[in-house]
From Swiss-Prot:
Originating gene: pdxS
Record-given protein name: Pyridoxal 5'-phosphate synthase subunit PdxS
Protein source organism: Thermotoga petrophila (strain ATCC BAA-488 / DSM 13995 / JCM 10881 / RKU-1)
InterPro entries the UniProt entry points to: Aldolase_TIM, PdxS/SNZ, PdxS/SNZ_N, RibuloseP-bd_barrel
Assembly and interaction partners: In the presence of PdxT, forms a dodecamer of heterodimers.
Catalytic-site annotation from UniProt: K82
Family in the record: Belongs to the PdxS/SNZ family.
């Protein structure tokens, strides 16, 4: 147990290195190089960005090994890759391949409708999505070393990411004011281990890095998520579905760095070209955020 705990501490320490940065979805070596040159702290290797997964439908699986290896060989920054929720075999394959981080992601079609992966059994660290404190702490209990909002990926609409971040921050604030017996009852209510709730109370935040993700499409969106308390930002379709990906990628990185400086944000937001076209979340047939439990 102590070995696993120590490993988790190392894993979450690795995730701390991403704080204040942008992690970008890429589908080719060329895109990965653009992301690295723009200042991304890591890239997420994918076969299709979330907007295309949403548009094309079908079963979305782990990217091909050839695709991931191509991206790993193209850049010197960490490379992440997604696996389906509960798909232990995909995760073992990616660990053997040598990716730096695995995202057990609701963007892909879930493989198990009852269980998430036991992430303690892996040496490679995992990031998982969450809509609230209960989901976040369940994933951390399973061994996640990093959390991100689920938002609504592939929409270019930040409203759901905002909702999830605000909800989580409000719940954390409530926890900091609770007595221990209240923590026990609250843990039962939200399905979270009381030991982790005690840690949240002590820290006044999640015990792991908490990024924003899902619908971030403009530098202003990225800055907004930082204002709401995010430690950094994942950008999926927002960069390479924009009119000028190079400019947009650089602008996203600068917006996360200077999120609290309106003068710089104004300058960043000028001459970046058209952002990706957004979708109204209320009109969606498939809500990826509802995948997972």
């Amino acid at each position: 147990m102590e070995i696993k705990k120590g490993t988790w501490i190392i894993k979450k320490g690795f995730a701390e290195m991403f704080k204040g940065g942008v992690i970008m979805d890429v589908t080719s070596a060329e895109q990965a190089k653009i992301a690295e040159e723009a200042g991304a702290v890591a890239v997420m290797a994918l076969e299709r960005v979330p907007a295309d997964i949403r548009k094309e439908g079908g079963v979305a699986r782990m990217a091909s090994i050839a695709k991931i290896r191509e991206i790993m060989e193209a850049v010197s920054i960490p490379v992440m890759a997604k696996v389906r929720i509960g798909h232990i075999a995909e995760a073992k394959i990616l660990e053997e391949l040598g990716v730096d981080f695995i995202d057990e992601s609701e963007v892909l079609t879930p493989a198990d409708d009852r269980f998430h992966i036991n992430k303690h059994e892996f040496k490679v660290p995992f990031v998982c999505g969450a809509r609230d404190l209960g989901e976040a702490l369940r994933r951390i209990a399973e061994g996640a070393a990093m959390i991100r909002t689920k938002g609504e990926a592939g929409t270019g609409n930040v409203v759901e990411a905002v909702k999830h971040m605000r909800r989580m921050m409000e719940q954390i604030k409530q926890v900091t004011k609770m007595e221990d017996e209240e923590l026990v009852a609250y843990g039962k209510e939200i399905g979270a281990p009381v030991e982790l709730l005690r840690e949240v109370k002590r820290l006044g935040r999640l015990p792991v890095v908490n990024f924003a993700a899902g619908g971030v499409a403009t530098p202003a969106d990225a800055a907004l998520m930082m204002m709401l308390g995010a430690d950094g930002v994942f950008v999926g379709s927002g960069i390479f579905k924009s009119k000028d990906p190079r400019k947009m990628a650089k602008a996203m990185v600068l917006a996360v760095t200077y999120w609290d400086n309106p003068r710089i944000l104004l300058k960043i937001s000028e001459d970046i070209g058209e952002p990706m076209r957004g979708l109204d979340v209320e009109e969606l047939e498939v809500r990826m955020q509802e995948r997972g439990w």
